[in-house]
């Protein structure tokens, strides 16, 4: 993956840009920026009641971003009543705890609206480098947290964060497996299905629809549903259809269809019409399609060579080539929105499942997880910087997130339960 230089641009005037430190997001020179984030200040009683949900989401966003080292508040020595203005801040106290940047947030409730102001300071110079205000419904403090965190991330990286995106996943309860949609961190989750076996959800490009495989007719069919809408069968009719994936333009879906002793990758219009097979191996299994970000290629899993491996083909089924040659059981590929990597699950020499990336161009494989239970079912964030996945490292299968190079692995803020097959939505059009 090409290294992105994270310009911290802590000096806004042009004359000072040459002095701005940079952080290389990937590679040996990467160093997260040490940042102090004291508890939010509140301007009225209404805001005080909303500090906890805001702070939980905001702290998680910054910690999981991978670009910041959020310092432990227990070590802070500055006055907790310190204000938002630079003149009221004792920067030497923040420097003493190792902070290079200071993030201050103030909250105020105005009727049904929660308003927030964020200020970013360079601890070394005492200069204010960012001042931004956002608001959100008062009953959704985490949305305000995501909006402010996104503004901070954009300031540092000059690209959108994943904080305003959504994830979908399956939550298992007894014999039921239901599809859920939630904020990227697992908050504000709500069920899309109710009862039965519903698996392998995938979000459309605009996030307005979820395709999933369901057994409601006692066979696997592919349905599409919008949050709050009715589920509609798009691939149904007796054969076993699984694992739909929307094309980047949202006009097509790729999926696997079992026919006798084989399973082939198909592509169809998003409404299920115009279906045609892209693979044709009489006794082989071809499954788990995932689109390249430009929609011109599809990666998939096939055992045509004797064991499940990741392959790539053109979106019309031509130009098939094998991508992975290490390991004897590779599955669940997901193509990075940046186009350079595919992340997948592999069974290693100890029969443990772990996550790896493979370069689309060179075939170089990089290990991301090891010695922490089974780690499976990865999906890239919409900016390609993070990966969501399932892990059994703490018992049951839970949702985790990490940076695309395998660092900074954290559990999502989900309730207790058993989770499967997460998928990440593209970024919303309006940030």
From Swiss-Prot:
<dbReference type="InterPro" id="IPR011042">
    <property type="entry name" value="6-blade_b-propeller_TolB-like"/>
</dbReference>
<dbReference type="InterPro" id="IPR011659">
    <property type="entry name" value="PD40"/>
</dbReference>
<comment type="function">
    <text>Part of the Tol-Pal system, which plays a role in outer membrane invagination during cell division and is important for maintaining outer membrane integrity.</text>
</comment>
<feature type="signal peptide">
    <location>
        <begin position="1"/>
        <end position="18"/>
    </location>
</feature>
<dbReference type="Pfam" id="PF07676">
    <property type="entry name" value="PD40"/>
</dbReference>
<comment type="subunit">
    <text>The Tol-Pal system is composed of five core proteins: the inner membrane proteins TolA, TolQ and TolR, the periplasmic protein TolB and the outer membrane protein Pal. They form a network linking the inner and outer membranes and the peptidoglycan layer.</text>
</comment>
<dbReference type="GO" id="GO:0051301">
    <property type="term" value="P:cell division"/>
</dbReference>
<keyword id="KW-0132">Cell division</keyword>
<keyword id="KW-0131">Cell cycle</keyword>
<dbReference type="InterPro" id="IPR014167">
    <property type="entry name" value="Tol-Pal_TolB"/>
</dbReference>
<keyword id="KW-0732">Signal</keyword>
<dbReference type="InterPro" id="IPR007195">
    <property type="entry name" value="TolB_N"/>
</dbReference>
<keyword id="KW-0574">Periplasm</keyword>
<dbReference type="Pfam" id="PF04052">
    <property type="entry name" value="TolB_N"/>
</dbReference>
<comment type="similarity">
    <text>Belongs to the TolB family.</text>
</comment>
<protein>
    <recommendedName>
        <fullName>Tol-Pal system protein TolB</fullName>
    </recommendedName>
</protein>
<dbReference type="GO" id="GO:0042597">
    <property type="term" value="C:periplasmic space"/>
</dbReference>
<dbReference type="GO" id="GO:0017038">
    <property type="term" value="P:protein import"/>
</dbReference>
<feature type="region of interest" description="Disordered">
    <location>
        <begin position="410"/>
        <end position="431"/>
    </location>
</feature>
